Amino acid sequence: MKNMISRRNFLAAAGVVAAAGVLTACGGSSSTAASTAAASGSTAAAASGDTIKVGVMGPLSGNVSVYGQAVVNGATLYLKQVNANGGINGKQIEILTEDEQGDATQAVNCFTKMVDEGMTALIGDVTTTPTLAVVAESADYNMPMVTASATAEAVTYDAETDTVNENVFRATFTDPFQGIKMADYAYQRLGYTKAAVIFKKGADYNEGLAENFVNEFESLGGTIVDQESYSEGDVDFKTQLTTILGKDPETVFCPNYYEEVGQILSQAESVGLTVPFLGGDGWDGLEGYASNDQL
C-alpha cells in the first residue's frame, strides 16, 4: 500500500521545494564539483536531529545533462542555505539526488527509489517527457514536486479530465506560451510571412512547441510552407533541410534541444539553407554545439 503524505507535511515540503524550484529556474551552468557529488547518487546535507528528505532529480548524464546539472546545483545550493539558517521548524534537510539520464522509465525508477528512501518532496524532473512520467506516478503518493523547466501544459493540467495536478508546481512557462510568442515575434516583429518547421516526432516538448507555433503563425496570416520531422537517434537531417530549402521559407522554427539544434544548424549551412532559425528554451546550451557564425 502506498503511503500518502499528510496535508501538513505536504504544505511544509511544498513551500521549500517551490522556493528551490524558483531559484533553480533562474540558475546557470553546472560546476564540476556539484556534478561529481550528484553523480554519486545521494548527497546528504549536514543534518542534526530529525531530517526532512527532499529529492532532487534530473538528467545528470546524457544528451541534455546541462539542464539536469543546473537544476541539481541550484536546488542543492538553496537547500544547503536553508540548513545553514536552521532548517525547517528546526529540522535539517537531507538531499537525495538521482540521475534519470533523460529517460522516462529511468525517471520513474529513480522516483520510486527515493520514495522508498523516505523522500517527502521532489525538485524535478527537468525535461518534459520524463517529468510527465513522474507526474503520473507522484499523484498516487500526493508527493509535492516542482519542475523548474518542464514546459508541457500536461505537467500541471490534465486536459482530458479538465483537472489540475494539485501536487505539481511549475517555475517556468508552458509550451503554448513559447510557441505562440515565437510565432508572434517572427510575424509581427521580424516581418516574416513564410516559415518552415523541423522537429522531433514523438517528443512531447518538440511537438508541443511546433503545434502552437504553426497555429499562431497561420492565425496571424502567415504561411507554413513546410513541416519536416525526424526520429529519436537521427543524426543526418540533410534530406529534411534540403526539402525545406526548396520551399523557400524566410525563417525556420526549430523547437528542439541544443545538441540536435547544433547539428541541424551545421547541416543547414552545408545544404545552402541560410535563413534565420528560431527556437525555444531548448536552445539553452547551444553555444557548445554551434559556431559563433551560426548563432
Language-model segment annotations:
Residues 119-227, 276-294:
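Extracytoplasmic ligand/sensor domains, especially the bilobed periplasmic-binding protein
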Residues 34-58, 87-92, 187-193:
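Immediate post-signal peptide segment of exported/extracytoplasmic ligand-binding proteins
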Residues 66-71, 85-158, 230-235, 262:
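Beta-alpha junction/loop-to-helix N-cap segments that form part of ligand/metal-binding clefts
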Residues 1-25:
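N-terminal secretory signal peptides
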Residues 26-36:
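Bacterial lipoprotein signal-peptidase II cleavage site
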Residues 64-89, 211-216:
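Short, polar/charged alpha-helical segment
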Residues 48, 55-74, 98-104, 126-127, ...:
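Extracytoplasmic "Venus flytrap"
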Residues 128-139, 235-238, 242, 247-271:
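Hydrophobic alpha-helical
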